[in-house]
Structures are given as structure tokens and as C-alpha cells.
Amino acid sequence: MLRSRRRVPHLHLIAKGLSCSYSSSLHHATHLRPNTPQQLQQQLLKQLVSLLQKHSSSRQATQQVHSHFITSGFLHSQQSTSYILLLVNTLLRCYSLGQFPLEALLLYKNLNYLSFDSFTYTFLLHTCANLHSIFSGLQLHALVVKVGFQSQVYVQTALVYAYAVCGSLVEAMHVFDEMPKRNTVTWNVMISGLAKWGHLQLSHSLFDQMPTRTVVSWTAIIDGYTRMNRPDEALSLFRRMAIYEGIKPSEISLLAIFPAISIVGALKICQSVHTYGEKRGFNISNIRITNSLIDSYAKCGCIKSASRLFEDTSAQRKNLVSWTSIISSFAMHGMGKEAMERFEKMEEVGMKPNRVTFLSLLNACSHGGLVEEGLKFLNKMLNSYQIVPDIKHYGCLIDMLGRAGRLEEAEKMALGIPVEILNVVIWRTLLGACSFHNNVEMGERVTSKILEMEREYGGDYVLMSNIFAGVGMFGDAERLRKLMDKRNIFKVPGHSLV
């Protein structure tokens, strides 16, 4: 009894550095007054479980409870085994769903002498999914069969999920087909997994066979069509769900359909979804909905609605994606000045830009002919925010310089791009600028660079041939055409929309 009570003050240590509510709960745990050592142990274990459930997203809280659990001697107790297992499972769940899932497997390995239940293996399989570790998933599958939990529906569903996430769809379907009883979650996991990996026909077939379709089921199949760049089918399913089936789209449903709306430029649907989101309170409760609406309005050609929605959103709700979305919106509409103004306001409110923000800014400068401003943003990106440009940033800069006729600067920049990220698109961008400005000398140098990297694309030969022809060098143009024939390189035929 004395030994058990001496361990209670350890809880004061793990309270340090945590939130007030967490510390208060721990303080309460240290002042429990049970009648027996077993009751003390059970109440402490229950309190630790409660703390984990309240702070499941905190790695610090999880690790500190984990540490106390190990050092307290609970593991060597022959009593309160059900409470010990509950705490272990809660720890596994926190680790499996958090940012450090590997720690769940390490915890299980260190405690493999305990008698686990089906929930243990469910959480471990979610860990494998989070780690994208098919090898660990296969090992756990074998272990599940060995310990006799292979017929538990939650374990089977977790197996389907782990296999589907890892792309092992044959194994996922095998487990799914062997299940005598499937719940809605199992169906949704299988449909979503198949759709995610591009097996839309099979996914849709399962969707049609599903006994009861929920909003999650509809969202999974809609998201699949959107991901596979089939927006018309996605929009058709969305209408069918909302209008004909009478199922109210969730926030996730809206996030799944926005890319399809943007691809086809369906402004009326965008407006309808906006109105629906307002009625359901999604636009206020979820900033991702607002950000997606801003982006969709801009891609549907309505920059006025995108700008109005951004301005109507309170400063407290706006995040980095909100600012980047409106900057990108102005950029795609050629409104470079407005994009830069939003960037200045963004800095004023203390929001730190990322590489996507700068990419949008450089895009705006390129399409707006704002070369000096673009170069200043490059300098700010490098020196003020220590962001290293990637190939997309370089592509924007070379396009910007090329449009402005500053070809020597563009070539110098292209030659300075690190070899490990340089690709042929950079040189093709510069070749396009050479063609526009009839710069034969540089065009030849750039074409030589392109052919060192890739010889099979006919468009490069044609473009250089056109440069020659544009300045009256018809012999050189003909020579390049003959070289195409000699190398059996074909020009991709164009087509008219008329």
C-alpha cells in the first residue's frame, strides 16, 4: 500500500509544461483517496486514460503519460489488467493517429507479453496504414489469424483499410470478399481505396452493390472521379446525391466537388454550393470551404466574387491558404498589381508566405509584365524568408524574362539552375521566347541543350525551324526538317475546335 501511494506524486512531474486543464486534471488524480491499493491503481489508470482521450493530439502529453505508465510499475501488477489494457490501447490509438505512428509499433513490441484484444490490432493496423508499411501490415495480418481475431469485423475493416491505403488492392479485396458481415465503414473503406488508386469501374460497381449508401459513400466515389480528372461524372454524382437521393452533402463532400467545379468552370454550381454552405454554416465553421470557394470562383472566371468573399472573411479566420488563394486568383486573371497589394497586406498582418505564395506572385508578375517586381520578390524569397526556389519558381522567372525580351538574363538564370532539378521544360520555355523575339543565335544554343536531354519530341525541331524561317534562313529550316525525317521524329498533329 505504501509503495502504491509513493508513486502517486510522479503525476505532478508530468503536469509540468502542459495546458492548465491538463495540469488541473493531473492534480485531481494525485489527490484521489480510495479505500484500497487496487482502487487507487484503477482510478489512476482511468484518470490517465481520460487525460489521453482529452489530449490525444498532443505528442508531449502522450509520451509523458506513456513514461509514467512504464515507470509506475503498473505493468508488473497482477491486478487491474483490464484497465491496463485500456490504457495501452488508448496509447496505441493516440500514436497510430498522430504524427509519430512508429511509436505505436515500438510500444506493442515492448509489451508483447500482455494479452491483447481486438482493439489492439485494429489500432496497430491503422498504424501500418499511417506508415504506408505493407510489410508490417502483412505481419500483423498473420498475427491476427494466429491469435484468432480474423473474424472480428473491426479488425477485418482495419485490414481492408491498411491494404487499401498501401495500394495492395488484391489483398484488400480478398479480406473484403471473405467477410461474412460488412458494416457501412467496411464498404466505404473499400470503395474509397479503389477510387483513390484509379479503379473507378470496380469502385463504382461496389458502390452500386452497397446495401445502404451514406454521405461518406457518395463522397468517396465523387472524390475518386475528381481525382481521376473526370469532373463531369463527379458533378453528375453530386447532383444525384443532393437532388435525387436527398442526401445532404457534408463539408468533406463540398471539398471533394470543388476541383470538379473548377475544371469545368461551372459558375452556377459554384454559386449554389456557396449558398448551401452558408445555410449549413460550413463557410463560417470551416476555413477550407471558404478558401476552396475563393479558388473555384477565380477558376470559374468570377474574380469579383472571389475577391468579395476574401474581403468578407474576417482577419481572424484567414490563414496562409486564404491569402495565397486570393493572390493566385489575381495572378491567373493577369491582375499583378492587385496580387502584390494583397501580398503587402499579408505581410502587414504578420502572415509568413511559403513557396506556393511566391509561386503565385511570380506568376502574377510574369503575366503582368512586372519584371523588376518579380526579381524583387525572388530576392525577398531568398534573403528575407530563406526559401530556396524550386523548378516551378525558375520556370516562372524565365517565362517572365522571356516575355519581356530579356533573353540574356533568362539564359543566364537557366544555366545557373542546379543540375539535380533542371529539366527540359525550362529550355523549351526559353526556346519559345527565342521564337517570339526571333533570336536565332540563342535559339540554336537552347535547341542544342534540349536535344542533349531529349531528342524524340518533334515540337522542338519545328519551333527552331520556324525561328530560322522567320528570319529568312530557309536552308537551315529545311535542314532541321530533314533531320527530323532522318531520326524518324514526327510532329504531333494539331487540331481545331471549330
Region spans (language model):
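Terminal (and in a subset, N-terminal) low-complexity or junction segments at the ends
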Residues: 1-183, 192-197, 201-214, 223-498
